[in-house]
Amino acid sequence: SGHLLLLLGLLTLWAELTPVSGAAKYCKLPLRIGPCKRKIPSFYYKWKAKQCLPFDYSGCGGNANRFKTIEECRRTCVG
């Protein structure tokens, strides 16, 4: 019972940390800050440079290539 619980916990952790197969699709999207006026510190993945870079998100619009932290960007797009 204890081993089964440990295995279940490890599988859950693995599932949470493994990037989704569709992630690369939106990592290739161009930077879109959106049309609104706010300046929310965010990160996007620059496909050609193969790196996560900072930008100020406007608060609306944009696309899925937008992350709250550089760690989230790297985990999703860099691997």
From Swiss-Prot:
Changing residue 48 to A: Important decrease in binding affinity for Kv. Important decrease in binding affinity for Kv. Important decrease in binding affinity for Kv. GO terms for molecular function: potassium channel regulator activity; serine-type endopeptidase inhibitor activity; toxin activity. Pfam families: Kunitz_BPTI (PF00014). This is Kunitz-type serine protease inhibitor homolog dendrotoxin K. Changing residue 75 to A: No change in binding affinity for Kv. PANTHER family: BPTI_KUNITZ INHIBITOR DOMAIN-CONTAINING PROTEIN, KUNITZ-TYPE PROTEASE INHIBITOR-RELATED. It is found in: Secreted. Serine protease inhibitor homolog that selectively blocks voltage-gated potassium channels homooligomer Kv1.1/KCNA1 (EC(50)=0.6 nM) and Kv1.1-containing heterooligomer. Negative results: does not inhibit serine proteases and voltage-gated potassium channels Kv1.2/KCNA2 and Kv1.6/KCNA6.
